[in-house]
């Protein structure tokens, strides 16, 4: 099949998905020719799309042709991503038209339908690459804190050597300033920065400020969205943060929304641009119950719950978002300066602050619910990466920061674990597991953990994969306990209640009494 016929199939896909109308066919065809540098197309016989062909299958022969004819540097993930965004950008109308359609759907059918359609649209134009996301491995594990969700992340492509070399040669630029800036919309991209011709964002007003809604190209849960500030300003938790989160819920009540903490170690991977993450998912933490419920003396109509969770979580509920934001700010300001030597909590080292929060908001019927997760980023000699961070004993599984998504009970584990766990399973079923584990460079770092697992579990060839997945879930629960500022011990729970006393809270009921 010729390149012209492959492009005709891509046009048919666009028509079938209603990305373009029949009146856009010639215009879009010419844009595709321009994108590929085709100046003298040969006449073609119209080719109808095979219904079984997915978008990645339609794009594959175009990549091959582009690489063979010098239109693409190399047939690798980096260059394929740049070309696919350029090609699919030919099907995407101006931002104003995407916004108009979104707002029209929202007005006629409500925000839930509008976000659902916009999500589908983001998939159809290949901004969300479902073929990549499908590679991720998912499972759940029951624990004392409820069922935790586990993911091995295989969706982010590795940079190929050619692209890495090209990136070193390329002139550094500050446009767009980061991956979240609104200037990414329609951006051509480079080996250093993803192409975004097929990317669109929806304006949202939060507390009289301009923010934007988009979806994450690396979806970790249903309708995983990012809400970003219009201006490139750093992450900062304040009363305004709580007000913005609750304002968003007023407009999109079917989503949860949360913010990463604003300090290194306990924050997310991007601290330079203020943003939230949300979506249509009920996380394990949201399903966790409050062990104790309190009234706050100065905030009538707002209840405070101590959540049964490995991290230290206070749950506010109220029907007035303004009152909930006031109570959240009270907790935050109290925590910012709170120290408890017996619990190992120090608010400051000199002038350097350590205490902050990870806030997560959702609607619960008519109520506004705001979880305040207490965080501290202090380090010491024993824990140079963070005292309330995954400890050395679990680094063979994960040593990265515990951000918003993991705080809520969804583990995002590194892709290396897929092969390492496969090798670990084989070693555990071998004649000499200890030697097999210790001599294999892929499993040596897991050997102590794997041998301990063997001592407490009966392992067979039939159940080894399940046992490993369950034990990874238990490691994740322990990682969350490490990140918790008040520990799951009698002393830790007592220390947590000392902090609650500082808030002026009065007990109402307890599941423990």
Curated annotation (Swiss-Prot):
User: Is the keyword Transferase assigned to this protein?
Assistant: yes
Instruction: Please provide one cellular component term from the Gene Ontology annotations of this protein.
Output: cytoplasm
Among the GO molecular function terms of this UniProt record, one is: UDP-glucose:hexose-1-phosphate uridylyltransferase activity
Q: The organism sits in which domain of life?
A: Bacteria
Instruction: Show the PROSITE patterns listed in the entry.
Output: GAL_P_UDP_TRANSF_II
Q: Which pathway does it take part in?
A: Carbohydrate metabolism; galactose metabolism
Q: Which InterPro entries does the annotation name?
A: GalP_uridyl_Trfase_II, GalP_uridyl_Trfase_II_CS, GalP_Utransf_C, GalP_Utransf_N
Primary localization class, coarse: cytoplasm
Where is this chain's protein located in or outside the cell? Cytoplasm
Q: Which reaction does it catalyse?
A: alpha-D-galactose 1-phosphate + UDP-alpha-D-glucose = alpha-D-glucose 1-phosphate + UDP-alpha-D-galactose
Statement: the UniProt record of this protein carries the keyword Lipoprotein? no
GO:BP terms for this protein?
A: galactose metabolic process
Top class in the EC scheme: transferase
Entry EC number(s): 2.7.7.12
Q: Which UniProt keywords apply?
A: Carbohydrate metabolism, Cytoplasm, Galactose metabolism, Nucleotidyltransferase, Transferase
- Tell me which Pfam families the record gives: GalP_UDP_tr_C, GalP_UDP_transf
Family label: Belongs to the galactose-1-phosphate uridylyltransferase type 2 family.
Which PANTHER family does this chain map to? DUF4922 DOMAIN-CONTAINING PROTEIN, GALACTOSE-1-PHOSPHATE URIDYLYLTRANSFERASE
- HAMAP family linked to this entry: GalP_UDP_trans
- Name used for this protein in its record: Galactose-1-phosphate uridylyltransferase
Q: Which organism is it from?
A: Bacillus subtilis (strain 168)
Q: Which gene encodes it?
A: galT
């Amino acid at each position: 099949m010729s390149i012209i016929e492959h492009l005709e199939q891509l046009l048919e896909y666009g028509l079938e998905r209603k990305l373009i109308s029949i009146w856009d066919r010639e215009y879009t065809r010419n844009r595709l020719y321009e994108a590929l540098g085709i100046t003298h197309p040969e006449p073609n016989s119209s080719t109808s799309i095979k219904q079984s062909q997915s978008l990645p299958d339609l794009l594959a022969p175009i990549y091959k042709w582009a690489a063979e004819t010098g239109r693409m540097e190399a047939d690798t993930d980096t260059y394929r991503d740049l070309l696919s965004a350029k090609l699919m950008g030919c099907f995407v109308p101006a931002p104003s038209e995407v916004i108009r359609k979104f707002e029209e759907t929202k007005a006629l059918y409500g925000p839930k339908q509008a976000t659902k359609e916009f999500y589908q649209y983001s998939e159809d134009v290949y901004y969300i690459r479902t073929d990549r996301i499908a590679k991720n491995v998912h499972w759940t594990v029951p624990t004392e804190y409820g069922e935790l969700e586990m993911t091995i992340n295989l969706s982010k492509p590795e940079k190929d050597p050619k692209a890495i070399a090209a990136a070193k040669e390329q002139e550094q630029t500050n446009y767009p300033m980061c991956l979240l800036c609104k200037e990414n919309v329609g951006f051509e991209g480079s080996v250093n920065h993803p192409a975004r011709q097929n990317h669109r964002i929806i304006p949202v007003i939060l507390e009289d400020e301009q923010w934007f809604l988009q979806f994450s190209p690396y979806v970790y849960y249903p309708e995983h969205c990012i809400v970003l500030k219009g201006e490139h300003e750093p992450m900062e938790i304040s009363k305004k943060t709580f007000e913005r989160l609750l304002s968003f819920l007023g407009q999109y009540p079917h989503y949860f929304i949360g913010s990463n903490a604003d300090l290194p170690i306990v924050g997310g991977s991007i601290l330079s641009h203020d943003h939230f993450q949300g979506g249509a998912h009920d996380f394990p933490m949201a399903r966790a119950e409050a062990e104790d419920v309190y009234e706050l003396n100065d905030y009538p109509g707002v209840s405070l719950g101590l959540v049964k969770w490995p991290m230290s979580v206070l749950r506010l509920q109220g029907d007035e978002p303004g009152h909930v934001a006031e109570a959240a700010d009270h907790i935050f300001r109290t925590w910012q300066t709170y120290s408890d030597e017996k619990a190992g909590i120090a608010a400051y080292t000199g002038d350097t602050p350590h205490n902050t929060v990870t806030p997560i908001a959702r609607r619960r019927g008519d109520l506004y619910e705001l979880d305040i997760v207490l965080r501290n980023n202090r380090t010491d000699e024993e824990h140079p990466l963070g005292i309330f961070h995954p400890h050395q004993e679990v680094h063979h599984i994960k040593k990265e920061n515990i951000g918003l998504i993991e705080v809520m009970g969804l583990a995002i584990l590194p892709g290396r674990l897929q092969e390492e766990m496969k090798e670990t399973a084989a070693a555990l079923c071998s004649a000499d597991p200890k030697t097999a584990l210790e001599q294999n460079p892929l499993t040596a770092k897991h050997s102590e953990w794997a041998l301990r697992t063997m001592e407490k579990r009966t392992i067979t060839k039939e159940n080894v994969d399940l046992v490993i997945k369950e034990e990874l879930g238990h490691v994740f629960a322990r990682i969350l306990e490490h990140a918790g500022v008040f520990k799951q011990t009698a002393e830790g729970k007592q220390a947590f209640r000392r902090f609650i006393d500082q808030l002026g809270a009065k007990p109402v009921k307890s599941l423990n009494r």
